[in-house]
């Protein structure tokens, strides 16, 4: 379903209720933008023997539901996502929660078709993208990395490196059962970042946030 209200109109209504307007964006797991031919360079490109073939990479066979993803190494991807942040920021949103700043789950066969640096999931490209998004936001809009606490604790959130990030805020999503261990980890692994822990209240209905 597609609505007709603009981002500015939505943010205005939220603010008029005395609330903060937060936007939530899934970034690199975007299957639409790079599916348009003119935007193919925003997605992963097939490479053989160091030469781009002109074909696009999909996370499975295209005729069986495979989808393209945005490549954080692409200048077109960075510009596209920066423009989204700029629009939300200028529309009056207090914060943008950015999720899915990650690589796809590459399989061994992909090693033959992707640049070695991409197949190795170089975290620097993700961190550079996060910093570019932070730079695109106005001073009135916070960029918040919306991450899986479990993945962050186990090295799966490659973008999460407080020593290299210009982003000041992160939100770690977890369950109430893991909240204690995540809390202990977050308190000593946040660097200069302000980290919040978000989890359901046990019934699956509530939403609790603890800030560090």
Regions found by a protein language model. Name each.
Residues 28-86:
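Active-site-adjacent "subsite" loops/lids of carbohydrate-active enzymes
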Residues 110-124:
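Glycine-rich tight-turn/loop motif centered on a GG-T
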Residues 1-4:
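Aromatic-lined carbohydrate-binding/catalytic grooves of carbohydrate-active enzymes
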């Amino acid at each position: 379903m597609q609505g007709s209200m603009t981002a500015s109109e939505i943010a205005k209504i939220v603010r008029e209720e005395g609330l903060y307007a937060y936007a939530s964006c899934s970034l690199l797991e975007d299957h639409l933008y790079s599916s348009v031919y003119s935007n193919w360079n925003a997605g992963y490109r097939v490479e053989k023997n160091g030469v781009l073939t002109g074909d696009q990479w999909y996370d499975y066979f295209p005729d069986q539901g495979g989808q393209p993803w945005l490549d954080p190494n692409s200048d077109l991807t960075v510009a596209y996502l920066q423009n989204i942040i700029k629009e939300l920021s200028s529309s009056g949103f207090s914060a943008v929660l950015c999720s899915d700043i990650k690589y796809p789950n590459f399989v061994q066969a992909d090693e033959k078709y992707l640049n070695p640096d991409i197949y190795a999931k170089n975290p620097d490209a993700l961190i550079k993208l996060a910093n570019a998004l932070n730079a695109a936001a106005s001073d009135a809009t916070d960029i918040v990395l919306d991450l899986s606490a479990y993945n962050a604790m186990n090295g799966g959130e490659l973008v999460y490196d407080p020593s290299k990030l210009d982003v000041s805020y992160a939100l770690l999503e977890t369950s109430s059962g893991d909240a204690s261990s995540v809390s202990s980890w977050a308190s000593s692994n946040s660097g200069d970042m302000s980290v919040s822990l978000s989890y359901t209240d046990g019934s699956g209905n509530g939403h609790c946030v603890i800030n560090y």
